[in-house]
Amino acid sequence: MLSIKDIDTFLNTFPIQKDEIVPFAAKAGGGWLDPDTAVEFCKGCGISLSETDGYLHLKTSTNSIEDTVFCFVDIETNGSNPKNSQTIEIGAVKYKNGVFTESFERLIKSDHLPANISEITGITMADLKNGEKEKDALAAFREFLQDGLFCAHSVDFDFSFLSHRMEYNGLFPLLNKI
């Protein structure tokens, strides 16, 4: 699994030649792909890319602030370790050019909810009983997020936890700029 530092280090090397994205895509779980497929894989994982004369550029570093989509995310989990805990709620709003444009909210089915988590979040087992499967909620969240700039109060935790849970559920990790 790529760490936030690995992703950030890579994203700070842009612009890069198109073929330089192949090793990163392989490490992120896409396998060894041709450059065009590696670009599409990374775009699908949330990296906002544009291409000029064989060089890849991050749109998030060239877009004006008015053209940037900020996605403010908050998650709730039933524990702090994504290896043995899961996401139980995802909430997010998109903000662009001074306007909130979309929102996203999912409760996620779980058989485990410690009393202290219920007390902190206000979420009950009854709420989670009819929740979505975690994989489905995470896939829907990725589609909502697209290549938006991932923002959160506890960004390292939220981003890492969601990315790990995506991989655990057979999805590719998040690679969005944070």
Model segments located where?
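Conserved non-catalytic scaffold segment of RNase H-like nuclease domains
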Residues: 57-59, 68-176
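A generic structural signal for ordered secondary structure
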Residues: 24, 177-178
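N-terminal accessory regions of nucleic-acid-interacting proteins
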Residues: 1-68
